[in-house]
């Protein structure tokens, strides 16, 4: 099948029709669809083109049914030492059964209902503070097995996370069990978790901006405070988590730094955000956060409470 598919894909690419409702049928009752694909990379050797696609959908005509599931870039050893020889691990979580199976040394298969797949992945990402990716997704559809293959962006790294310092969970399984999906904003969790995790791989000025945006968005969309200004929205979020006293300490830190913009003193986190946006890569921005790490620690604590709130997981205390 690989040679046949490769030839058809190459011909479609040369004709400029690769991503225009492309599909091909193979001899073993398999159909390959590229309508949702995009090209990550193209390698050319003479007349042969090797394409790396970010997404491919397969459909198998088969009388056998397979439970809905996904394969993620999490080594199975992270699931209580799951191995090829060991039995699968099934837990009761998120109102359903979630089963973890060994796939290979670097990936784990999770069998659960489609409704909670992204939530499970987000919780695992949150626990490890690392973007967990869905590499394969399979489900039964119209008496066919549909499989979606996705390219991997980053290998798994167990870099540790402060998030597990705030909950009674010794491992990722316990962490997932603590989650509560019975609230109206549970499907917002993946978006906020991505923002939270992404904030760890940028500069400190960028991080401040991202965490500020998280706090603003939480007030506007989750607390439903409406179209306020950014400063008001962030203060609504901070007030919601009872951190007003800590906010005043951050304001005092900003005032003591004697930062100025257009001749005016910077004294609030909103004014600091505006300065960071306009002078993101300035020496002043880097020096401020290097000399005053408590500012981003405060913003991180608010972001941490946001994602924990959306996950339905109570923290060990009201103060992080």
Model-derived segments and their meaning:
Residues 1-203, 289-320:
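Charged, non-catalytic interaction/linker regions at domain boundaries
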Residues 191-194, 203-213, 232, 261-271, ...:
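Short, well-structured alpha-helical interface segments that form or flank functional binding sites
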Residues 194-196, 234-243, 278-289:
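Surface-exposed loop-to-helix/strand elements on domain peripheries
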Residues 208-225:
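Hydrophobic alpha-helical packing segments in soluble, helical-rich domains
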Residues 211, 227-231, 286-295:
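Composition- and surface-driven signal marking solvent-exposed, interaction-prone regions
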Residues 220-223, 274-282, 304-315:
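Charged/polar positions within long, soluble alpha-helices
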Residues 221-263:
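Flexible secondary-structure boundary motifs
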Residues 255-289:
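Histidine-centered, metal-coordinating catalytic motifs and their short helical/loop contexts
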């Amino acid at each position: 099948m690989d040679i046949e598919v490769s030839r058809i894909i190459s011909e479609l690419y040369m004709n400029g029709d690769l991503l225009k409702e492309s599909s091909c049928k193979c001899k073993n009752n398999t159909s390959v669809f590229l309508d949702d694909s995009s090209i990550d990379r193209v390698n050319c050797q003479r007349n042969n083109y090797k394409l790396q696609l970010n997404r491919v959908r397969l459909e198998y005509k088969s009388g056998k049914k397979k439970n809905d599931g996904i394969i993620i870039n999490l080594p199975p050893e992270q699931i209580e030492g799951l191995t090829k020889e060991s039995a699968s691990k099934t837990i009761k979580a998120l109102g359903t059964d979630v089963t973890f199976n060994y796939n290979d040394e670097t990936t784990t298969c999770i069998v659960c209902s489609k409704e909670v797949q992204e939530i499970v992945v987000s919780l695992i990402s949150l626990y490890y503070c690392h973007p967990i990716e869905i590499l394969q997704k399979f489900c039964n559809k119209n008496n066919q097995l549909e499989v979606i293959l996705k390219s991997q962006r980053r290998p798994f790294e167990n870099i540790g996370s402060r998030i597990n310092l705030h909950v009674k969970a010794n491992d990722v399984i316990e962490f997932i069990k603590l989650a509560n999906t019975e609230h109206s904003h549970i499907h917002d969790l993946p978006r906020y978790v991505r923002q939270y995790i992404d904030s760890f791989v940028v500069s400190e000025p960028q991080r401040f901006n991202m965490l500020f945006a998280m706090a603003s968005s939480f007030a506007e969309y989750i607390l439903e405070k409406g179209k306020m200004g950014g400063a008001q929205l962030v203060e609504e979020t901070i007030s919601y988590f009872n951190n007003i006293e800590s906010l005043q300490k951050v304001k005092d830190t900003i005032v003591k730094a004697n930062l100025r913009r257009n001749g005016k003193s910077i004294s609030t986190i909103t004014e600091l955000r505006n300065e960071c946006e306009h002078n993101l890569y300035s020496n002043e921005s880097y020096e401020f956060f290097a000399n005053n790490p408590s500012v981003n620690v405060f913003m991180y604590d608010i972001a941490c409470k946001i994602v924990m709130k959306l996950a339905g997981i109570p923290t060990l205390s009201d103060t992080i």
